């Protein structure tokens, strides 16, 4: 909806729920997942990434990412296109001014203070601690960080993510962790033989999936 355009680039747990039932779109999505799990009597512990970032559960792992910043960049950069390499950083600052997740170049890292420095659109330099929900990670280092912080033993993923999982495993080792056992599966295709992809919007809802 057009009314959500101003929420672009906010964390999903800050985006308004378009259905008006929950505090955020993230809470809406989490509720749908938990409803599915509960209907089938799954025994699970629900982990909120937003809560773990804000409550400091990920802090030690984030500091390790910062301490090994250069080595991690050496692993990630060869997998990126030239244009992307120019501004890439594992850390995405969350602007204290707008609350938006920023994909900007990092001007400076301070391993002693545990901070990163970036420029706002106004040109103002902002120094942020990487702790307590001030930043989030790009998805590949985030994957590795969660394995480390949550002591994940086993991870499944589609075969299109094999290179990303292998890269995340390298990052996990760099920060002192042991990657989980990895298992990849074949891709699910739609009626046109195209890969089902949430980024393309041709996926199935949980309701449709259960119906089939």
Show which residues each predicted segment covers.
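N-terminal Rossmann-like or analogous alpha/beta NTP/dinucleotide-binding catalytic cores
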Residues: 1-73, 168-169
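Alpha-helical recognition segments enriched in aromatics with Gly/Pro capping
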Residues: 68-71, 78-212
């Amino acid at each position: 909806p057009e009314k959500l355009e101003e929420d672009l680039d906010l964390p999903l747990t800050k985006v308004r729920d378009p259905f008006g039932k929950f505090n955020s779109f993230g809470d809406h999505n989490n509720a749908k997942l938990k409803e599915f799990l509960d209907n089938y009597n799954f025994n699970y512990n629900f982990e909120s990434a937003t809560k773990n970032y804000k409550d400091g559960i990920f802090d030690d792992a984030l500091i390790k990412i910062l301490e090994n910043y250069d080595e991690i960049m050496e692993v990630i950069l060869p997998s990126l296109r030239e244009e992307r390499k120019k501004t890439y950083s594992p850390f995405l600052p969350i602007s204290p001014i707008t609350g938006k997740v920023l994909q900007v170049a990092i001007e400076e890292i301070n391993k002693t203070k545990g901070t990163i420095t970036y420029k706002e659109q106004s040109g103002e330099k902002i120094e942020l601690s990487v702790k307590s929900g001030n930043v989030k990670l790009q998805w590949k280092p985030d994957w590795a960080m969660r394995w480390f912080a949550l002591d994940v033993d086993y991870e499944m993923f589609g075969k299109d993510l094999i290179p990303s999982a292998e890269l995340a495993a390298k990052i996990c080792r760099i920060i002192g962790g042991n990657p989980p056992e990895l298992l990849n599966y074949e891709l699910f295709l739609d009626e046109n033989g195209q890969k089902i992809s949430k980024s393309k919007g041709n996926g199935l809802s949980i309701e449709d999936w259960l119906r089939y």
